[in-house]
Amino acid sequence: MCDTCGCPSPSDHSHDHDHDHRHDHSHKSGHSHSKTVDVHASLFAANDALAKANREHFNEVGAVALNLISSPGSGKTTLLEQTIDALKGEIRIGVIEGDIETERDALRIRAKGVPVIQLTTGGACHLDAAMTHKGFHRLQKEPGGENIDLLFIENVGNLVCPATFDLGEHERVVLVSVPEGPDKPAKYPKAFTSSHTFLVTKTDLLPYFDFPVPEAVGDALRLNPQLRTMSLSSKTGDGMETWLKYLRELVANKKAGKLK
Amino acid sequence: MHEISLVQNLVQQLKELAAENQATKILRVTMEIGPLCGVVVDSFRFGFDIISSEEELLRGAELLIDIPTVRYTCTGCGKVIVTAGPRPDCCPACQELTLFPEGGDDLILLQVEME
């Protein structure tokens, strides 16, 4: 149980990983006093336990959580700004911004009038479930933060490391912008195999870059045939309706108890 | 370099294990690193070497790494490919590109030898 509010997260100081210490195989080798212990514990277990608690916490407050993963500069924050403008008055949005340094993204989102907090990792290349847990508590104390339908967690810009850490999100969205090139699914498979949705962004730049969308999407689908795929431009608004429809459906499904 | 933070988690677990077993020295650590778990073996080893050199408990400890196999099933013809190596580009039998992977996605502390 969390010390801050009693949410399902284990408290920060608890021994929350359940490694199963099987001491029955331990033995002493003949020449020294050494002892071998079979542990068989996943190093992801601690993060996964906290992520599960985060998910329960989001469920308790009725929020759908999305984890946005991409390289730096793919347009995550701009997409959020446009999304907030489009859904204002309809869906209550909250944002957790993850960056290595600066409050810049949080300032941009705050200017849109929604509750936001900035997590600065001080060098870490990804968010983890513990940071997300603390961040969500801070967010809930922001004006409007007590009632959130849709929580965006904007991960640190990095297509590699964030893919390994479950934050407790309901949906993971991976973004690739047109200038980055279509080879990202092939080169960074884990981000695509672990995601629910693949978004090609900055499609207004397609005339200037060699980015065959079907090739990128095809590569991603080969890795993960269940992946939902969309293309959009936050600048021109092309494709935004499909994205907004997806978000509306997620929130509606959450309200109807269909999303766990 | 998320490998460093994973190594830090590992070191924390090793300290707890050593305390539980009244050990003062970790001699050997055996890890299983799945090819699909998103961890680069060389980076993990590099992180382990750095952190273990700074901890009295771990100084000089040997890190053994097991790479388990992944079972890929071809969605075209059903052929099964079992490998601990890189993800196959396509099915060697029918050239289908979509292969369904099972296993090899975890990072596991298997065994610790201490004294």
Q: What annotation goes with each model-predicted range?
A:
Chain A
Residues C5, N67, D99, E154, ...:
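Residue-level signature of catalytic and energy-coupling elements of molecular machines
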Residues C5, L119, M230-S233:
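Hydrophobic residues at beta-strand termini and immediately following loops
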Residues L79:
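Hydrophobic positions on the alpha1 helix immediately C-terminal to the Walker A/P-loop
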Residues L205-K260:
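Canonical P-loop GTPase G-domain recognition
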Residues C161-E169, L175-Q226:
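Conserved C-terminal guanine-recognition region of P-loop GTPase G domains, centered on the G4
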Residues H33-L66, S74, T83-H170, G181-D183, ...:
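Nucleotide-state-sensitive switch-loop elements of NTP-binding domains
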Residues M1-V39:
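Histidine-centered metal-binding segments
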Residues S71-P72, I96, V156, S177-V178, ...:
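G-domain G4 guanine-recognition motif of GTPases
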